């Protein structure tokens, strides 16, 4: 595995009154870490980033604890379970700008710059975070992945409506 690809989680929901990200991160941060690690393995990424609102101090605290626990259990870090696969996740606190909910602005902010959208193309999957191909999903999408793997896609699509399967 190389450091060619990046995996990223947008936990910077900016819509007024939206608390889905906060609820998931406060309740089950390990689901997001697990999914990002699985995706990292699938695409050959060795680094993930979670961009979370600084205004969610409990979510930030629980993410830090979950990351430390995952490292202690060797679920994150170098040579996970002697597999040769290494994957780390770092937190980045959002700067409070609504525009950083846009994926390219979010990546610019993670890189330490002012969060302003980049023109596309190139798209993040081609040239994203730190110039590397990047996959970026929101908290809800990441949190669903372990359950879909565990229960199967039929289980997931049994929720929702005929025209909108799943949790949305």
Residue ranges and their predicted role:
Residues 1-4:
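Short, small-residue-biased leader/transition segments that mark boundaries at the very start
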Residues 18, 34-37, 47:
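Peripheral, non-cofactor segments flanking catalytic/redox cores
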Residues 29-42:
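Histidine-anchored nucleotide/phosphate-binding helix
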Residues 25, 52, 134:
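Glycine- and other small-residue-rich loops at beta-strand/loop junctions that grip anionic moieties
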Residues 60-168:
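Hydrophobic alpha-helical positions that pack around
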Residues 6-30:
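Glycine-rich phosphate/pyrophosphate-binding loop regions near the starts of catalytic domains
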Residues 24-25, 33, 55-58:
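Cofactor-cradling patches in redox/metallo enzymes
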Residues 47-54:
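Short internal beta-strands
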């Amino acid at each position: 595995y190389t450091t060619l690809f990046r995996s990223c989680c947008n936990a910077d929901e900016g819509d007024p009154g939206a608390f889905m990200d906060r609820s998931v991160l406060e309740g089950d941060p390990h689901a997001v870490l697990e999914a990002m690690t699985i995706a990292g393995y699938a695409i050959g990424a060795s680094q993930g980033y979670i961009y979370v609102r600084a205004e969610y101090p409990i979510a930030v605290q629980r993410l830090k604890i979950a990351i430390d626990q995952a490292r202690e259990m060797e679920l994150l870090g170098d040579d996970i379970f002697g597999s040769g696969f290494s994957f780390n996740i770092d937190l980045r606190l959002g700067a409070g700008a609504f525009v950083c909910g846009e994926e390219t602005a979010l990546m610019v902010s993670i890189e330490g710059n002012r969060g302003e959208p980049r023109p596309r193309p190139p798209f993040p999957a081609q040239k994203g975070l730190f110039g590397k191909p990047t996959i970026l999903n929101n908290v809800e999408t990441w949190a669903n992945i372990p359950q879909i793997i565990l229960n199967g896609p039929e289980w997931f699509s049994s929720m929702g409506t005929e025209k909108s399967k799943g949790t949305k």
